[in-house]
Curated annotation (Swiss-Prot):
Subunit and interaction comment: Homodimer. Forms a heterotetramer with IscU, interacts with other sulfur acceptors.
Pfam families hit by this protein: Aminotran_5
Protein's UniProt name: Cysteine desulfurase IscS
Organism: Buchnera aphidicola subsp. Baizongia pistaciae (strain Bp)
Enzyme Commission number, as recorded: 2.8.1.7
Family: Belongs to the class-V pyridoxal-phosphate-dependent aminotransferase family. NifS/IscS subfamily.
Entry binding sites for pyridoxal 5'-phosphate: 75-76, 155, 183, 203-205, 243
GO terms of biological process kind: [2Fe-2S] cluster assembly
PANTHER family for this protein: CYSTEINE DESULFURASE, CYSTEINE DESULFURYLASE FAMILY MEMBER
Length: 404
């Protein structure tokens, strides 16, 4: 085994060897390093051809038309382009947008930005299992609602939203529907020919492709319009200017091609490992499962260990690469806003650990992780006066704490 063991695949993934190998062919003088916008010579033609092939590979994974794929720098930019772009283009039609309080910061902060610009944003609170209340969504729709933006799979707890039902509600009310699919693409099957989704954000680095490249699906029929957020040479049909990074796009295409082949085998393999991990730790006293197995991807297992501080546990698990929440917010010492939205008390939210598994995780790594968790929890709790009080029968909910 190689240490530390990587169990943070929801943050990013290692690049597949085949992806890296193909990317190298588009970087140096010996390869096809041209600008795809250079249409007057072979270097540009070859680069453009490579981009077209990758665009098709991406479209095939999600069953879309390749002309509906726009390249961006990643899912964060795609979310910004989708939400701001729709808000600006359709502002004469309405200024109301609906999203969920457990969305990724790329969506929440974009919506807060629009609030400061005069837009009306409704933040749905999730049910206890993390899904949105479909009936509440219907109730919150107004005459001036122009967009609903909901993530497919939550990045902290792995819950899967019913985007099929949501899309039907949006379609029946003539409202555009945007989906953040950064955590679902390549993990569960998505067929955009069957789903009435208007915009979908995704990236490469969550499914064994390079960082710094992503995409936005924009439906052609019926046509969805949006305002560009980056202006310049009019690349990507005028929706996202900037010279295309051919090597990254090629890498993304290969990663999506591999994902199409391995999606089902990956799912079953990772589910087996997730179950092995949970079965190995579920009998630990005062452990709380924050990921509902019935409606989540197996790639993410979020648990809380009561009377153990999450940051302390992460330091104790120094041979494991895990996180206490989203990689984008794990530097904050505040309790996870996602877990608090589910109704968890701060104590449990603070003691949460996200284990995220991937294609290269092994059974031996899971078994080592189980052993290390048991040892670390026992050691930390033996040092905790709160654990001692709990074991002595003190009702912790009735303790009157004095704050200095």
């Amino acid at each position: 085994m190689k240490f530390p063991i990587y169990l943070d695949y929801a943050a990013t993934t290692p690049v597949e060897f085949e992806v890296m190998k193909e990317m190298m062919n588009y970087l140096t003088l010996e390869g096809e390093f041209g600008n795809p916008a250079s249409r007057s010579h072979k270097f540009g033609w070859k680069a453009e051809e490579a981009v077209d092939i990758a665009r098709n590979q991406i479209a095939e994974l999600i069953h879309a038309d390749s002309r509906e794929i726009i390249f961006t720098s990643g899912a964060t930019e795609s979310n910004n382009l989708a939400i701001k772009g729709i808000a600006e283009f359709y502002k004469k039609k309405g200024n109301h947008i609906i999203t969920c309080s457990t969305e990724h910061k790329a969506t929440l902060d974009t919506c807060r930005y629009l609030e400061n610009k005069g837009f009306d944003i409704t933040y749905l609170n999730p049910l206890q299992n993390g899904t949105i209340n479909i009936y509440e969504l219907q109730e919150k729709i107004q005459k001036n609602t122009i967009l609903v933006s909901i993530m497919h799979v939550n990045n902290e707890i792995g819950v899967i939203q019913d985007i099929h039902k949501i899309s039907k509600i949006c379609q029946s009310n003539n409202i555009l529907f945007h989906v953040d699919a950064a955590q679902s693409i390549g993990k569960i099957n998505i067929n955009l020919k069957q789903l009435k989704i208007d915009l979908m954000s995704f990236s490469a680095h969550k499914i064994y492709g390079p960082k710094g490249i992503g995409g936005l699906y924009i439906r052609r029929k019926p046509r969805v319009r949006l305002s560009a957020q980056i202006h310049g040479g009019g690349h990507e049909k005028g929706m996202r200017s900037g010279t295309l990074p051919v090597h990254q796009i090629v890498g993304m295409g290969i990663a999506y091609k591999i994902a199409k082949i391995k999606i089902n085998s990956d799912f079953n393999y990772i589910k087996h490992l997730r179950n092995r991990l949970w079965n190995g730790i579920k009998n630990i006293e005062e452990i709380h499962l924050n990921s509902n197995f019935e409606n989540t991807v197996p790639h993410i297992l979020n648990v809380s260990f009561n009377y153990v501080e999450g940051e302390s546990l992460i330091m104790a698990l120094k041979n494991l690469a895990v996180s206490s929440g989203s990689a984008c917010t794990s530097s904050s010492l505040e309790a996870s806003y996602v877990l608090r939205s589910l109704g968890l008390k701060d104590e449990l939210a603070h003691s949460s650990i996200r284990f995220s598994l991937g294609r290269f995780t092994t059974k031996e790594e899971i078994d080592y992780t189980i052993q290390l968790i048991h040892q670390s929890i026992n050691r930390l709790r033996n040092l905790s006066p709160l654990w001692e009080m709990f074991k002595s029968g003190v009702d912790m909910n009735n303790v009157n704490w004095t704050h200095n």
